[in-house]
Every structure is written in structure tokens, then in C-alpha cells.
UniProtKB/Swiss-Prot annotation:
EC number annotated for this UniProt entry: 2.1.1.182
Name by which UniProt lists this protein: Ribosomal RNA small subunit methyltransferase A
Alphabetical list of InterPro entries matching this protein: KsgA/Erm (IPR001737), rRNA_Ade_diMease-like_C (IPR023165), rRNA_Ade_Mease_Trfase_CS (IPR020596), rRNA_Ade_methylase_Trfase_N (IPR020598), rRNA_adenine_dimethylase (IPR011530), SAM-dependent_MTases_sf (IPR029063)
PROSITE patterns tied to this protein: RRNA_A_DIMETH (PS01131), SAM_RNA_A_N6_MT (PS51689)
GO cellular component, one term: cytosol
Length: 263
């Protein structure tokens, strides 16, 4: 562990919590600006740490809630910013839908832990009707996978599941040199904006279909899907392709033509 001290509060940066603290204020200002958060929005920050992003949000937003798992950091934020609400707990247990008051969607921001980036993204996907946008800093490699296009090595389950239900924007890259302790990898900021309507009536069924279609990337769609689905309505030529060759629209169309073998 590396000890990090700020304003007489010292924490041992915990690798299991993915704690890397941002030190460049230009990055936090840019993140808040591109998030589009307005003064009257209900804003939620994930993982404030020592408050690098919190400081900018407090200046811009009147209704801010932060979620912090580390007790020492949660206490620090309470003392430093007594005007905001602090939820001390695991973001993966947070019911964002319940937080969206009177049907007013949240604006979510955060420098999310590398160690649980994918679980956080899928948790947000479950609560996509609760937020207007989520502007998140994450590992650069994951950001590339999120924004990936078909027929690339990065294109897979994460890209398809997130892009099917949200507009995904890669905003900018962040050097590892602006963090303490310095991580081994670069970061990036992305923005997720949920689509107004879901592209598939059975959203959970589509997400399961995507996992099966990409389960073994080197196999054709036919080989990946035949055990789980009735494929008689699907063009046989298309079934000879790999999932990575199909756009999200094509995967949605394919999903509309198949039925699970239990149906």
C-alpha cells in the first residue's frame, strides 16, 4: 500500500478498492463541463476520494450526493463539504432508481475504481432509466472496449450491451501521471446517455443472447447459438459469421428472429 495524505488526512491507497487519487484540476473541470451537469440537477458522484471532482461539482451544483466506500474518506468528505449528502457504502448496492426523486433523472459522475469498472457499468445499465447521463473516468483499455466498432478486437459483449441501450461517447484520454499513486495504465473519460426507449422489448433476453453469441469469439454464430436457440428463421449465410462481424442493429435484428429452445 502507498500512503496518501491530503489536508492532514492520511489513507493507505487500497489496491482492492482501485484507489488512485486525481491531482490535476484541469481534468476535473473538463469532466464537469462535458458532463453537462446543471446547477439544479440532482448529481451523484461515485468514489469522491479526497474530493478532486467533488470540489468542482460543489461549485456548479446545488444538489450533490457522493458515494464512498472507504470510511476514512467518507469522514473526510463529510468534514470538508458538510453541505452535501454522503452515502458510505458499496456503489454496487445502491438503488439509483430510488434516488431519482419525482421522476427527475440523475446526473452521475465519477472516477470509478479500475477493479470493479465492468460491474459498475452493468449496475448502471440495470438502472438506466434513473439517470440522464453518466460521465465516468476509467481505465483507457475499458473505455476503448466500450466505444468499440464492429470487426475490431475491442468489440465484444461490453460494447454491444452498453451501446444497444446507451449512446457511448469517448471524451478524452487522461495521463497516468495525474494520479497518486500513479497507476500502471492510462485512463479515459466516457459519457453514457441512455436511449429514450429500449431497442429490444426483452432487454434481459437480448443481453443473455449477446453473452452467448460472443461466448467463444472464434466460433460462428451458428456454433455459439444452436444449443440455446431455434434458428430456423435466420439466414444461413449470416449464421456462418462471427458475432464480432455484426453491427448492433444486425444483432438486434437477429435476436428478433430467434426463440429460446425452452419457448
Amino acid at each position: 500500500m502507498i500512503n496518501v495524505e491530503y489536508k492532514h488526512t492520511q489513507v493507505a491507497a487500497k489496491k482492492k478498492l482501485g484507489q488512485n487519487f486525481l491531482t490535476d484540476r484541469n481534468i476535473t473541470r473538463k469532466t464537469v463541463l462535458l458532463s453537462g451537469a446543471k446547477p439544479d440537477d440532482q448529481v451523484v458522484e461515485i468514489g469522491p476520494g479526497f474530493g478532486a471532482l467533488t470540489r468542482e461539482l460543489v461549485e456548479e451544483c446545488h444538489n450533490l450526493t457522493v458515494i464512498e466506500k472507504d470510511p476514512t474518506l467518507a469522514t473526510f468528505i463529510r468534514n470538508e463539504y458538510p453541505q452535501i449528502k454522503v452515502i458510505e457504502g458499496d456503489v454496487l448496492t445502491i438503488n439509483f432508481s430510488a434516488m431519482a426523486q419525482a421522476g427527475k433523472p440523475l446526473q452521475i459522475l465519477g472516477n470509478i475504481p479500475y477493479s470493479i469498472t465492468s460491474p459498475i457499468l452493468f449496475h448502471l445499465l440495470e438502472h438506466r432509466r434513473a439517470f440522464r447521463s453518466a460521465t465516468l473516468m476509467m481505465q483507457h483499455e475499458v473505455a476503448l472496449r466500450l466505444a468499440a466498432k464492429p470487426a475490431t478486437k475491442e468489440y465484444g459483449i461490453l460494447a454491444v450491451q452498453m451501446q444497444a441501450f446507451c449512446k457511448v461517447e469517448y471524451l478524452f484520454k487522461v495521463s497516468r501521471k495525474v494520479f497518486k499513486p500513479q497507476p500502471k495504465v492510462e485512463s479515459a473519460v466516457i459519457k453514457l446517455t441512455p436511449h429514450a426507449t429500449d431497442p429490444a422489448l426483452d432487454a434481459d433476453g437480448f443481453r443473455r443472447f449477446v453473452r452467448i453469441a460472443f461466448h467463444q469469439r472464434r466460433k460462428t454464430l451458428l456454433n455459439n447459438l444452436k444449443e440455446s436457440y431455434n434458428l430456423e428463421l435466420v439466414d444461413s449465410n449470416k449464421l456462418q459469421l462471427r458475432a464480432e462481424a455484426l453491427s448492433i442493429e444486425e444483432l438486434l435484428e437477429l435476436f428478433s428472429l430467434i426463440k429460446t429452445k425452452s419457448e
